[in-house]
Amino acid sequence: MLNMESAGVSAAMAGLSKSLTTPFSINDILTRSNPETRRMSSVDSEPEPEKLKPSSDRERSISKSPPLCCRDLGLYKLTQPKEIQPSARQPSNYLQYYAAAMDNNNHHHQATGTSNSSAADYMQRKLAYFGSTLAAPLDMRRCTSNDSDCDSPPPLSSSPSESPLSHDGSGLSRKKRSRAAFSHAQVFELERRFAQQRYLSGPERSEMAKSLRLTETQVKIWFQNRRYKTKRKQIQQHEAALLGASKRVPVQVLVREDGSTTYAHMAAPGAGHGLDPALINIYRHQLQLAYGGLPLPQMQMPFPYFYPQHKVPQPIPPPTQSSSFVTASSASSSPVPIPIPGAVRPQRTPCPSPNGQMMSVESGAESVHSAAEDVDENVEID
């Protein structure tokens, strides 16, 4: 007989331990993401009426009389072994555990002789935060054995109207203004008026708003945005122009449109070429020495940089028959053939020079190369 009673007590304690499981166990944490497993575990954790056999007066009072905290809130239905909806099984287990834990405290108060009304009021005040519906989510971090953790209400309430987050969301949605959508005709009229007048007075703004069926605030904001857009576009164009000017390099055109070629030394003296005049004069002097002292076309003064105005050298006249020797100065300025006894003298044909003077050009005959000190001459054979 004692063995039967001990077996019944152990079975009842096992059933109570299964029904009083907390959501902080390893199985609940691992199966939190799987609703099917959680549903099966909640079904398994429900106590069967055969297993819950009270073995003492305290357990008999628990099974017969509903707890005081659940009597007014309608939570006594959770202790009955009838079918519960799947959506409400998980919160019912939490509330069942919480109600059973507080019921033990109530029996402790009865044994010590304290009043049950204060405990019932305390439980009603504690459970009022969770609402009367079972489908409301609960924050079990606040439902521990320590009563000080349950002083503040849970973050989620049963009804959306009572939630502070819903009030904040409605406030944010109320503050957010919808963006006005203008039609093509309204935009065209606004652009036309902006091209005529960038700033509108109060009467002009109200008149235009009435004609376009807009508010004065919309017209004012549109003009402000349009002025800002125009200013930003002008700044971007100015920056692009500065970047283009910094990358621009002066380049001389060497080939004209008609196909003729022009060079820096052939340009007019007053033409704006962007180069240093001293460099141009040095370049002209080198070209003149390369051409044998001949004056370059379109150049009135051969070396205005090296000589003053009254000492500009003139082209050397053609040599005569009596000249048999060449001075060092004439040899350095222009090449003149040196006559050699017994050699055939080449024929010379006079030709006009650009400045109106006569110059001689060698043609026909054969010239002989003669080596002298510090003098080199070129021999041309036709």
Swiss-Prot record:
Q: Which organism is it from?
A: Drosophila melanogaster (Fruit fly)
| Tagged with keyword Flavoprotein | no
Per the record, DNA-binding region residues lie at: 175-234
Task: Mention one GO biological process in which this protein takes part, according to its record.
Answer: visceral muscle development
Q: Which domain of life is it from?
A: Eukaryota
Q: Gene symbol?
A: bap
Q: Which UniProt keywords apply?
A: Developmental protein, DNA-binding, Homeobox, Nucleus
**Do you know which InterPro entries this protein is assigned to?**
HD, HD_metazoa, Homeobox_CS, Homeobox_NK-like, Homeodomain-like_sf
Q: What does this protein do?
A: Involved in the determination of cell fates in the dorsal mesoderm.
Where is this protein localized, as stated in its record?
Answer: Nucleus
> What does the record say mutating residue 327 to N does?
In strain: S-26F, S-94F, S-438S, S-510S and S-521F
* Listed Low complexity bias regions: 158-170, 321-335
Effect listed in the UniProt record for changing residue 342 to S? In strain: S-26F, S-94F, S-438S, S-510S and S-521F
Compositionally biased residues, Basic and acidic residues: 48-62
| GO-annotated molecular function | DNA binding; DNA-binding transcription factor activity, RNA polymerase II-specific; RNA polymerase II cis-regulatory region sequence-specific DNA binding; sequence-specific DNA binding
List the SUPFAM superfamilies.
Answer: Homeodomain-like
What tissues contain this protein?
A: Is expressed in a segmented pattern in visceral muscle and in a subset of cardiac muscles. Loss of activity results in segmental gaps in midgut visceral muscle.
**What protein family is recorded?**
Belongs to the NK-3 homeobox family.
Protein's name according to its UniProt entry: Homeobox protein bagpipe
Provide one Gene Ontology cellular component: nucleus
Compositionally biased residues, Acidic residues? 373-382
Q: Which residue ranges does the record annotate as region Disordered?
A: 27-66, 144-178, 314-382
Lineage, opening ranks:
Eukaryota, Metazoa, Ecdysozoa, Arthropoda, Hexapoda
